[in-house]
């Protein structure tokens, strides 16, 4: 079998040469390649294949290397036997059987948790009850911590009494006498002296009993005590000898003072305030002038009727 020499100088460009080179490239076998995953599986899962590969390499160097084209053709016709990966279910079962419970509890990683969840769908449902879960691991840690705290506080561990059901039933049947009061257990109290102690002060100390003339306050706070009426002192007659500085009268209803401080009668003072000049003497009267005012108890109609009667009586006269 002739081997193709790829290093010979190529002839000038032509249609025939290009077609020949294309056919030669198409007929050239492509060596098989392995993915990274298959290579890892070869090294980790199939140790026998690794030894076989090392033996074949030793024979290869001892016998001599064949030509490159013959090696490529042999690989294309008869590819090397690849490692057969185990099934997913078998792999899950093997991993679950190989992992011990102690190691599983010591390292609860997320990978173990993921493998466990996938394996639960593949294994028998009765096996799932005995298989620990990630939540069980956390609960076991919490329970162990609580039991340790209880053992620190109490002299006897409570877990031993809780695990034994017979002891639990016995404790329920036993009477609980902690809160029962038994007077026979207590000694009777005997006072040292039988004579009563004398009272220091037998008389009552309440202020109501000590005061003889005390009057208690009224019971109803809303009822106020009657207050005595204050008597108004009589006004001092300071104007008994007063004389009006304008009209020289001694009788008036009210004495007033002008701007200069002089004493004036009521008529003269009001006239000055209204007209801004002194009251003339021609307007002076001997008596006190009063207005004709109706009484407070009289109605206005009766007052008008009385005025008309007076005017009619005066006209008849």
UniProtKB/Swiss-Prot annotation:
Residues 307-317 have a biased composition (Basic residues). Transcription factor. Required, in concert with signal transducer and transcription factor sta-2, for up-regulation of the vacuolar H(+)-ATPase and acceleration of lysosome maturation at molt. Involved in regulating hypodermal development, perhaps acting downstream of transcription factor elt-1. Modulates environmentally induced changes in collagen gene expression, including rol-6, sqt-1, lon-3, and dpy-13. Involved in regulating expression of various genes, including gst-4, sod-3, ugt-9, and col-144. In response to oxidative stress, required to up-regulate expression of gst-4 mRNA. SUPFAM superfamilies: Glucocorticoid receptor-like (DNA-binding domain). The gene is elt-3. It is found in: Nucleus. One of its GO terms (molecular function) is RNA polymerase II cis-regulatory region sequence-specific DNA binding. Its main location: nucleus. Keywords: Metal-binding, Nucleus, Transcription, Transcription regulation, Zinc, Zinc-finger. A zinc finger (GATA-type) spans 244-268. The keyword Lyase does not apply. Residues 1-34, 290-317 are annotated as: Disordered. This is Transcription factor elt-3. It comes from Caenorhabditis elegans. Interacts with skn-1; interaction may enhance transcriptional activation of target genes. Gene3D superfamilies: Erythroid Transcription Factor GATA-1, subunit A. Transmembrane segments: none annotated.
